[in-house]
Amino acid sequence: MASAGKPALDDSRRGTGSPKMKARENAKDTLCRNVTIYGRCRYEDKGCAFNHDPLKVNSAYQFDSKKRFNVDSPSFTPSLLPSNGSSPTISSATMKKMATISPKAANAAPFQPRSVASRSNTSTPNSRQENINPDWTVAEVQEFVPQGFDVAHMTALQGNGNGTITPTNAFDPFVTASTPLSAGGAVGPVQPNPYSHDSAALGGAAFFPGSSGFQQPVQYHMYAPIGPHNQNTLGYQRNVHDLFLPNDFREELQKKAAATLQTLPNTQLPAQIDYFHSLVPLDLNHQKNATVFGFPSWVYKAQSSKDGNFYALRRLEGFRLTNEKAIRSVQAWKRVCNGSVVTIHDAFTSRSFQDSSLIFVTDYYPLSKTLAEQHLGTGQRFQGRHNVHIPEQVLWGYMTQIANALKAIHSNGLAARIIDASKILLTGKNRIRLNACAIMDVVQYDSQRTVADLQRQDLVNFGQLIVTLGANSPTVMHNPTKAMEHFTRAYSPQMKNSVFWLLNGLQKDQDRNIDIFITGISSQLMSTFDSALHLDDQLTSDLSRELENGRLVRLMTKLNLVNERPEYEHDRQWSENGERYFLKIFRDYVFHQVDAQGDAVVDLGHVLSCLNKLDAGSDEKITLVSRDEQSCFIVSYKELKKALESSFQALLKPARRMH
């Protein structure tokens, strides 16, 4: 029986035909999907039955389109059009009318598809050519095409390529696109590219976005990395400096802030000098030294009672003012505003130190050093240690900054008169400022030397300072010949010639002023200026990381202002239900986490992560459980942010009505 029934089963299979075998037979006319996706098929020479030539498939597709559409057939004209959204009711008279062809339909021009007409040689009669409407094409939206994919497959989607759209045919971006190998050349709606600009407003202009569009507001929780980016790191690598302020810069600012706020209790200093209080001595050497000014001088940090700022007070001990015009000369120095000169704010006499003292008020730079302390070993803890040789580029930086200071001073008809390593402040990395400039104008007010002579003396003092720094010895100018020999061996000829020109500043052989000197070192000025620009870029980049760093504090402030307000317990409009109940449970989720043993979880990372997501309004959903564990809610951070903003605005409404 089994053998007898077997042939009948085979006959039935041969009669119906196997779909798998039919697909095998048509495999040679089907384009391999590997070619469409990857551009090539690795099994092409290993028995793959599909076609690997896109041109053959395209020609077969065009031939199939020509077979399916007959251009000589009459156009179809429906005799009854349904209304919008309603199905028509067809009567017997209407059915009879539809059974016959109207004379208008018999004389109509033959139907010709647009996609076929562009590829066939058949043309419509010339008498009907003028009445044809402009060709309708789909918006040429730039789409992703895999590598190796033949662009001929997209011809059915591009229409005739004239780039025009009939206004009555609005583009619908939500209609699913038809595949190139379906519908036999019919033009279907194309799914827009989500990465193209304003795809719904494209009028055939694929590469020109619309003029109007909604601009999203700035998201302050996102920090944009501002240049410069000089680190040789890969795209996935991150440094600590990419996330926070550089440690050395942060520590330096914190130390300066601590030094500014430092106080000295139980001190023998006066409690107040004029309008200054909280004096702290800044001198490292407690021995009296009257070498520079002719009077022992001391420096203090003090706070002003007028504006609350901190200033440096330089006191000349034992000075007696004999001429009131001498102290008025400080008024001219108040007009000197230069980045390389320490600004002078005031000068007055005082007897608060139980003597007659002259006080100069200048800007205070915390943790600053003098060039003598930095390079000449003055005040060092280990006296036997040799000083480090100053690189030439650093020395050029000092020269350009001092030249900048002298340019500003001489332009105001003044002279520095004090250019000494012990009176030049180093306030930052290779950043110096000329200090104690106005003191000699008060102390030696009766001097008979002219301003021009004093300005030339500034050039000589300038040259002696550079030689002293280059030799790393404060007493090197006692033997000028030996000092210049060492300087010539250590530095370039341009540096040597510049210093020689400064040392000969008092000679009358030629006109010597600071402008001529600046012209001679103009090439080094550009190098110093470039370094200043790089520092500005770096500081701007560091500052951008600290932008809006108080946003989490504002967020926590809003949460605490909204949650658990006892005065609104019986207010129906402010009862803790709905969105305010979510915020209350969310506060417990962020700050009141417990572990499996019931101990409090102090996780700063969890708190910052939740607050950042709340500030950003993330779509991430979290599960919130009530305190009695009887209610469970699944909400997103976006919903929580919206609830927080609405609750906070509702909290402000009574205050607005009062005002």
UniProtKB/Swiss-Prot annotation:
One cellular component term from this protein's GO annotations in UniProt: P-body
Compartment annotation: Cytoplasm
Segments of this protein annotated with the region Disordered: 1-26, 103-132
Protein name as catalogued: PAN2-PAN3 deadenylation complex subunit PAN3
Record remark: domains: The N-terminal zinc finger binds to poly(A) RNA.
Stretches of the chain forming a coiled coil according to its record: 523-561
HAMAP family to which the protein is assigned, alphabetical: PAN3
Residues that, per the record, bind ATP: R314, D363, Y364, Y365, P366, L367, S368, K369, T370, S422, K423
BP GO annotations: mRNA processing; nuclear-transcribed mRNA poly(A) tail shortening
Annotated region described as Pseudokinase domain, given as residue ranges: 262-522
Assembly, per entry: Homodimer. Forms a heterotrimer with a catalytic subunit pan2 to form the poly(A)-nuclease (PAN) deadenylation complex. Interacts (via PAM-2 motif) with poly(A)-binding protein pab1 (via PABC domain), conferring substrate specificity of the enzyme complex.
Gene Ontology molecular function: ATP binding; poly(A) binding; protein kinase activity; zinc ion binding
Main location group: cytoplasm
Family label: Belongs to the protein kinase superfamily. PAN3 family.
Role of this protein: Regulatory subunit of the poly(A)-nuclease (PAN) deadenylation complex, one of two cytoplasmic mRNA deadenylases involved in mRNA turnover. PAN specifically shortens poly(A) tails of RNA and the activity is stimulated by poly(A)-binding protein pab1. PAN deadenylation is followed by rapid degradation of the shortened mRNA tails by the CCR4-NOT complex. Deadenylated mRNAs are then degraded by two alternative mechanisms, namely exosome-mediated 3'-5' exonucleolytic degradation, or deadenylation-dependent mRNA decaping and subsequent 5'-3' exonucleolytic degradation by xrn1.
Domain of life assignment: Eukaryota
Keywords: ATP-binding, Coiled coil, Cytoplasm, Metal-binding, mRNA processing, Nucleotide-binding, Zinc, Zinc-finger
Polar residues composition-biased segments: 115-132
Zinc finger (C3H1-type): 26-55
Region named Knob domain: 562-659
